């Protein structure tokens, strides 16, 4: 025991803690040197007991009133326990004792940052910059403040300075990617990370963020290459596998994506998001039983995963089990009632079940949420047309054109409805507009009303634009 604890050497942290706790039990007063007090404070911090650590700082300040370090420690502990006024008092005392100590201004800046007193935070961080030997974390906090102020350009500047001081600061690398994303400056992001990689080729975080930037620019092959480098450097990098899977999905490489998504399970527990992503891949491959199995795994892990509930509905819809699919579409809608895709699926399923009034209401909701959904305008008007509500169908398409004046599909559909309504002159005006917009799509007019093939006037006009 004596060999383990080296009794008699007060600098041994365990010995100091034992003496301190003995003093408390005996309600006595023992003397400890400054280093011993620091060791005792750190012991309680590591034990996640800030209250006892604070008690030690009181004894330390009492025995070593001119040691600023204990007032600084005390301030940190007051911040950790949300006692901000007391933290400010401790910092003022420390500043009186040691005004050139950078930690005083860094901690005060942290408190002001949490209080959203942005300028006060910046003033203290700037003061700390002039005093600190290592500045990358201070520069990072200044960047955070500018983000809170919505000034992402300035945040980028400070994040770059942070990385100049410490190229391995992972937080700065990720925050910089976030800022470039908010600013929609993906090309600048790519340029930065490529230059960074030239100097730090083994930075998995840089390769990962480069992959994300390529992804956002729809450069999916390049993003996959970047994720592969990130994985090569850090083979347990689950997020890189997941995002690589997403890129493969964008390239319609669903079977590969499934395998990559499943690789994440080797390095982190399965999540509802990953199960849902795998389910979507199986759905795209029309392997509906497997898709449904993974969607069910997703909602079991995360009942709030609305896309997975929706996915179950899609698999049932595919199997023409429309009534069952409606139940799951509504489960998704309960979680996200502003999702136009969910409303569209409900409208379509209700149409297939001949629930036409309900389908019409659902389509109205789709168009309220997403007035640029061309297919929804076409389908809604088609339901009305099938019920001989020709005027209403024309009215719906007219509203669709107002919201989507460049959509040739809507103009061609209007031609069909106007001919059906025997409004021939107006129909020909819309036909000219449709052909001017996109003559190659004229076939959709005949697909909807095949009998128009026999109309020589229409055929002649179309031939003028397509020959």
For the regions a language model picked out, list residue spans one by one.
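Start-of-helix register in tetratricopeptide repeats
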Residues: 35, 69, 103, 137, ...
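Register position in tetratricopeptide repeats
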Residues: 46, 80, 114, 148, ...
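Structural marker of alpha-solenoid helical repeat scaffolds
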Residues: 63, 96-98, 131-132, 165, ...
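Canonical tetratricopeptide repeat
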Residues: 73, 107, 141, 175, ...
């Amino acid at each position: 025991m004596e060999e383990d604890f080296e009794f008699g050497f007060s600098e041994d942290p365990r010995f100091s803690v034992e003496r301190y706790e003995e003093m408390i039990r005996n309600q006595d007063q023992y003397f400890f040197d400054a280093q011993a007090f620091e060791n005792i404070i750190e012991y309680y911090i590591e034990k996640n007991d800030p209250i006892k650590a604070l008690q030690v700082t009181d004894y330390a300040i009492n025995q070593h009133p001119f040691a600023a370090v204990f007032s600084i420690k005390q301030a940190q502990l007051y911040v950790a326990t949300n006692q901000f006024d007391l933290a400010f008092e401790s910092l003022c005392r420390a500043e009186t004792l040691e005004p050139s100590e950078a930690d005083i201004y860094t901690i005060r800046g942290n408190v002001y940052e949490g209080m959203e007193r942005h300028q006060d935070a910046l003033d203290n961080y700037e003061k700390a910059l002039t005093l600190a030997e290592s500045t990358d974390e201070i520069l990072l906090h200044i960047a955070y403040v500018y983000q809170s102020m919505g000034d992402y350009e300035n945040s980028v500047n400070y994040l770059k300075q942070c990385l100049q001081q410490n190229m391995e600061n992972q937080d700065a690398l990720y925050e910089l990617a976030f800022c470039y994303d908010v600013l929609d400056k993906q090309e600048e992001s790519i340029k930065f990370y490529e230059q960074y990689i030239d100097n730090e080729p083994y930075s998995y975080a840089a390769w990962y963020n480069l992959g994300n930037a390529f992804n956002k620019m729809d450069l999916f092959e390049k993003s996959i290459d970047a994720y592969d480098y990130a994985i090569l450097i850090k083979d347990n990098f689950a997020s890189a596998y997941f995002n690589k899977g997403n890129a493969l999905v964008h390239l319609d490489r669903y079977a590969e994506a499934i395998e990559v998504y499943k690789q994440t399970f080797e390095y982190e527990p399965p999540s509802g998001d990953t199960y849902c992503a795998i389910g979507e891949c199986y759905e795209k491959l029309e392997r509906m039983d497997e898709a449904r199995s993974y969607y069910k795994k997703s909602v079991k892990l995360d009942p709030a995963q609305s896309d997975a509930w929706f996915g179950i509905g899609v698999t049932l819809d595919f199997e023409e089990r429309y009534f069952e699919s409606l139940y799951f579409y509504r489960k998704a809608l309960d979680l996200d009632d502003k999702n136009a895709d969910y409303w569209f699926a409900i409208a379509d399923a209700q149409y297939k079940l001949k629930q036409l009034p309900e389908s019409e209401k659902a389509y109205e909701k789709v168009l309220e949420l997403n007035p640029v959904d061309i297919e929804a305008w076409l389908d809604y008007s088609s339901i009305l047309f099938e019920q001989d509500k020709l005027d209403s169908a024309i009215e719906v398409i007219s509203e669709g054109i107002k919201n989507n004046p460049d959509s040739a599909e809507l103009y061609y559909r209007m031609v069909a409805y106007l001919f059906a309504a025997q409004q021939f002159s107006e129909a020909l005006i819309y036909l000219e507009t449709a052909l001017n917009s996109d003559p190659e799509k004229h076939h959709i007019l005949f697909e909807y009303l095949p009998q128009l093939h026999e109309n020589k006037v229409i055929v002649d006009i179309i031939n003028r634009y397509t020959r």
